[in-house]
Structures are given as C-alpha cells and as structure tokens.
Design a protein with these regions (language model features):
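Anion-binding and metal-coordination hotspots
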Residues: 1-193
C-alpha cells in the first residue's frame, strides 16, 4: 500500500481518503501515506502486540450507546478511544461483532472440552504406549489449540504427562474474539461512522 501514494501523485491525484481492509495495514504503510497527506480509514489486523493489547483491554459493551446500525442482520457495537498504535497515540475504534463473538466462544469452549476429555482418556489409557507415540498423539489432538494447553512431561511415572488449561491464553482469546480494530486519520469521525 505504501507504494500507492507516490503513484497517485504521479497521476496528479494529491489528496483524498484511502479505505482498505486490515490485511495491508502496517506502521510503514500508515506513516508513509500520512506523510503524503492522505486521509486513511483502515482495519488493523490483530497481529502486533499494540493491536492485540488495544483490542483485548477495550471493553465494548452491548448497550444502546455503543450500537452501530447495520441493518437487521448484524449486531455491531463500537467504542472510540485513544491508544498507542504505530508508535504514537492515535484515535482508534474497537468494534464487537456480537454474533461472531458468541459463535467463536461457543466453538472454542466446545473444542477445549472435547480436547480435555481426549487428554484425560489418553492419560487413563496410556499403558503400553511409548512416550514418543503419546507425544505424537498429543500433537494430533492439540493441533491448532496447542496454546490453550500446558503439557508437562514426567519421567518414569504414569501417567507420563500432566496437562491443564492455559487460562491466560484462553482469556486473551476470549477478550479478542469477535473484536476488531479500526484506524482513521480523521479524528472527527465517530465510532459509528
């Protein structure tokens, strides 16, 4: 995206507002476009520590004041705040898609309970299995949910591993589920805008 500002200038287009989804947003992109004087409205992916911190620590309540009208199909709530993003304090909007939040939470809880039952069963029935085969089985069971579990290996003891839910990761996932971050250079825009 940062290459677009010089190209637009080459065509004589010197000002305006660029709008894009969160996939192309980086500190370099934002600062370059701001340097060229462009207004921005963009999503910010939950990849950087700054973005994750903003989203996870911002409470977006589902009350009338935070409701964003988007027709009959969606339940969106948003709050505006000032937070450090891309190296400086900026006005940002955190919005909550209540339907997505509820679906993510239900699906994750179901999966974590399913994995927990499988781990318990594996512990109870590990006799005759080598540690290596148990490690392989655990890898297959945990897959994309590994960060939600803490596994400890115990030498010369049965069961040969212990496990527990990683509540810190679970809470972080819960606090970011269905929530998204938006940034606009125009500070006159409201959360609803």
């Amino acid at each position: 995206m940062e290459g677009i500002a010089p190209r637009l200038s080459d065509f004589g287009i010197k000002e305006g507002t660029l709008v894009w989804d969160r996939g192309n947003t980086s500190q370099k992109t934002v600062t370059t476009l701001e340097k060229y004087g462009w207004e921005l409205v963009c999503g910010v992916a939950k990849r950087s520590k700054e973005a994750i911190d903003i989203v996870s620590t911002t409470e977006v309540t589902s009350n009338l004041e935070n409701h964003v009208s988007c027709g009959k199909k969606g339940h969106i709530y948003a709050v505006q705040k000032t937070a450090k993003l891309f190296g400086k304090e900026r006005n940002v909007v955190v919005y909550l898609n209540l339907d997505k939040y509820t679906r993510c939470l239900a699906e994750r809880n179901y999966k974590l309970n399913e994995i927990s039952a499988t781990l318990k069963n594996l512990q109870d029935n590990e006799n005759g299995l080598s540690t290596e085969s148990i490690r392989k089985m655990l890898g297959n069971v945990l897959k994309n949910h590994k960060k939600f579990f803490e596994i400890q290996w115990v030498e010369k003891q049965k069961p040969c591993f212990t496990w527990k839910i990683n509540h810190e990761e679970r809470i972080l996932a819960e606090n970011t589920a269905g929530k998204y971050l938006l940034y606009a250079t125009n500070e006159n825009l409201s959360a609803e805008d």
